[in-house]
């Protein structure tokens, strides 16, 4: 940690200091003067003839130091021997020129000036301190109004504003000395310096206790916060007003002579000049006793000049330079992408680097790259020079330089020596995850392009269509070591996002391997038997046996005991060849490759080899199968011709059939049986099914096996092989080429009803082409926009997670989360074993129904244990998670589990936050770039039924069914579930039944897989009559709350509930349908005894007439759902962003806060009141307000459970956290984020999302401050909260009560403990203003802060080094203490007893060895 500040800028002579933290606070005028080396009195910069700086000007050499090293300005003293002499003629100290980068000056202001940051940055700090509004403050500061500072005995009040006339009148009325009023910054300064902070804090606390209402306490708390922060930090309020202005060193605002006698200067010099000019003029005016109005105007101008210097454009007009361009002020230097933080401190340029185009290098090994000789020569120059000198081939650097420039033969030999085993880093922009920079050993090549190994392309996301890559040379030994051990491409086989191999063959290689492992009937040599692989190779070479023939052969294998055995297999020569490359291992048997290998299978093979045979073997294996894949693809000669796209003969019959269907729907619509919306949905559905059907026919045709005359199997269709192997192309693209193009989407995302029936092979008609251009254009536009959005999301994620590092091995927490298989629409999308892989078990995992332990508590679940869990049919597993980790800073290794990129338990010092951010952000860009591949084809079609995904017995939970007139079972309950139970009594699947669904099975019935369980209408929500009777309309008045929609096309009318609140008469209506008893004429009552009534929501379609007889189970009304929109990652990226930003959705769901019964209370103007009466008497009932006209799915008297939705919609994550706790929130977030990525087929491990959610949950909101210093509504860290509460409990005071809150990633980043990190993220000025008022200390624990101050990051090797240094330092300290104790005891023995001689400070030489040892 103890890093050295090379020279202390404020005092270069002082010894080098080490620091552990950085504090930011307000500078007092005395502090500014102590930094300064002199006052700047003139606005001049340099003399235009001599180019020497003017004395007392902005570049004065007397104040800031000499212009040339060790030479005074007039040239009287030169060279080192006069170091430190001050020249008596020109007053310049003889020293290094670089002090001009460090020495500051100052300007004595003739009138105080307010610091604009503390005035205008919201909330205004000066305003809060004085309890004045910003508008009033500006009036005083810019000399419009007077303010009363000391009212005396008059009836004016403190802080009252007066205009000039009022002020003069008051002076006449009360006399000039009766009260004090003032104007300008002086007045504000007087008021600020008069504040007694402790007294104010006391008063505010008292007021807070008595304050009631909503706004008053908030306001008091705000003021109290700022007063407390001034007290704690030791700042004084009046320091927010400047009396002395610091001037930054001249080298930091340089003036550079251009050719032609002109100068380029930093804008700051202009801004400083304006300040000095106005300040000098003001001084002169005051001396001359100028009229008040003139002086006041000059003061106002001075204030404006200083404002512009600090933050140009924050107030008033922007000050522009000569070319109408706004001048860059001090704030602009820090802000934004081009500011100091992001441009220079976080984004430095690198020396020893070069870039060039990349080409493929298939003959390279995985750890190599081809480096052009020209580049290598340039990059390794210093190494070559030193080697040339060492060999005696040159005596000076100059000579060596000449040799290299001439490119003599010996230079090349030396270059070879230098480069041997010296890794270089290759990087491809955009570097979206850590695999975008990898280390390789360079191989010198002719030519000018870098050669890249084909297998690492997917990690870099590189292709060879003109991509460029950058090369960097690690110079120091440590850097070379890290490059080799951590970043070598061979050490990065697995992806950190999901733990799957990322070094995977693609395209040609996959095609070659697919072709190699094909098996065809009736080929030459079928049925032959071979004794060894060599024999097979011989037969292949001789042409006696075909690559794809079925043969029998023996091959060496390892059995489970580890002995070599020879086994016989029925296989093909191609597979045998591949099997011969497999490392010999019991876990990698020949069966692994004895099948048709598609891309996924190849990935599995590599994964298996990596897991069981070690890294070295797997890397060699990868290289070999790459070579084999390329070779075989080339030999196979698989090509692509237009005739390979087959159009099925059945296409037109299918299309015509659907055309007739669509005509029928049109007719139904004309007859008024269905609405426009329903017709649209049905048509779109029919066409999307038709398009799928045609595609299916095409695939069947193209994949059909054909035989030649001899009965031998023909080679499959080459396009089919490309797509089926996973090399290139997808069924969706083949469908467009050979099936029908399908439905298209409009630019706004709606699906056009008429599909494109032609495919590309047949050609499109003009209209079809026009329709298809929408999709294409939308795709391109989307791509451009999304790249930016995705990059910004990654940046926010990195910022929120950057200080999440593995800091300890085990935090010892008892908390955990429950993992279960992810199920989507009753289909298991990721099994339990996949979700718990690489996690640590929090409890013993038992075989269900027994006491047999599968995985013990605290064990890491690896592949083997995960398989055991699967075999045991465990349904739920408690696992440790970063969310519940209780480590002080960062997380612990046990809670995090396996490091996905290494396959072992994570190391201490791993920056898991950054890895999580990259893993989530990287696919964002990938996905966004992949929107347009399918060309905007709509994947329409809504699911409307559910089939059993497994065999088992049906079990209903909370059943509530009603049989309608047709004998169908209709679901009437809100929380009914249907579960499928297997023989062992384990629950295999549960489905939530929506209200109004038809159930096709009975309770306890056994079902086979594929049985239809229930169906529902995907387009409308029905409202169903519970009992039979007569329907009676209430408040459904035509023209007010009901509109009759007459369809022009059909002439049929429909009654639709319209928004009655918008009509003048409709304010108090409550439109509903009541079911009446036809005999008595009273409303029918349900089981709870309430009258059966159905409130209508806006846009509901009425299905019954007033007075019509209805039967139980009939539909009374239908509420339309949203139309089918296309699912595109467009929904995806913004969705992920809004989840991580924790935004409340527009119409968010209302979640029940506790178990209870629903009651409808008295209505407001346009809201309905729903109350939940809790079952538990101790709890209070909770009220919700719902806008009238919204559909409420619960009835009076319904029982709801905690967490049920009272109103449909997307839930707000804050509500989930508040009501159901952290684990429910985590599950919600993980499921929602994974949903988006899964749609794109991207796998991301859950733990990355958990790490980000953990960072969002770091703060607690104080609900009740108790007797602590914490304030209600304040956000504090858990550590801070615990500390404060412990103190309070020790002193017998009431502790504060708080609850965890969820912050969006932007908010969480801005509220981190480190102000340096927050300032470099966003809103720089606001963050720095706040931090300086509070006197914040940055402990430098995160990554960003350390990079900014120029240290190694406290993660990885940097963390290890600092840890070692700390241990060494502690040991030194103990040694020193021991020596000191020894010396003291010896001294005590030697000293005479009666009078102890005080040797004074001279004797301290023995003890103080600290200085000499401290590094």
Swiss-Prot record:
- Key words, A-Z: DNA-directed RNA polymerase, Magnesium, Metal-binding, Nucleotidyltransferase, Transcription, Transferase, Zinc
One Pfam family this chain carries?
A: RNA_pol_Rpb1_5
One GO term describing the cellular component: DNA-directed RNA polymerase complex
Positions contributing to Mg(2+) binding? 463, 465, 467
> Which positions bind Zn(2+) 1?
72, 74, 87, 90
Catalyzed chemical reaction(s) = RNA(n) + a ribonucleoside 5'-triphosphate = RNA(n+1) + diphosphate
| Residues annotated as binding Zn(2+) 2 | 811, 885, 892, 895
> E.C. number, please?
2.7.7.6
| Molecular function in Gene Ontology | DNA binding; DNA-directed RNA polymerase activity; magnesium ion binding; zinc ion binding
BP term (GO), one: DNA-templated transcription
Coiled-coil region(s) at which residues? none
Would the keyword 4Fe-4S turn up in this protein's UniProt record?
Answer: no
Q: Which InterPro entries match?
A: DNA-dir_RpoC_beta_prime (IPR045867), DNA-dir_RpoC_beta_prime_bact (IPR012754), RNA_pol_asu (IPR000722), RNA_pol_N (IPR006592), RNA_pol_Rpb1_1 (IPR007080), RNA_pol_Rpb1_3 (IPR007066), RNA_pol_Rpb1_3_sf (IPR042102), RNA_pol_Rpb1_4 (IPR007083)
Cofactor requirements of the protein: Mg(2+); Zn(2+)
What is the cofactor note?
A: Binds 1 Mg(2+) ion per subunit. Binds 2 Zn(2+) ions per subunit.
Please, which domain of life does this record's source organism belong to?
Answer: Bacteria
**Could you say which enzyme class this protein belongs to?**
transferase
Q: Does the keyword Metal-binding apply?
A: yes
**Assembly:** The RNAP catalytic core consists of 2 alpha, 1 beta, 1 beta' and 1 omega subunit. When a sigma factor is associated with the core the holoenzyme is formed, which can initiate transcription.
The entry sums up its family as follows: Belongs to the RNA polymerase beta' chain family.
Described purpose of this protein according to its UniProt entry: DNA-dependent RNA polymerase catalyzes the transcription of DNA into RNA using the four ribonucleoside triphosphates as substrates.
Stated name of the protein: DNA-directed RNA polymerase subunit beta'
State the encoding gene: rpoC
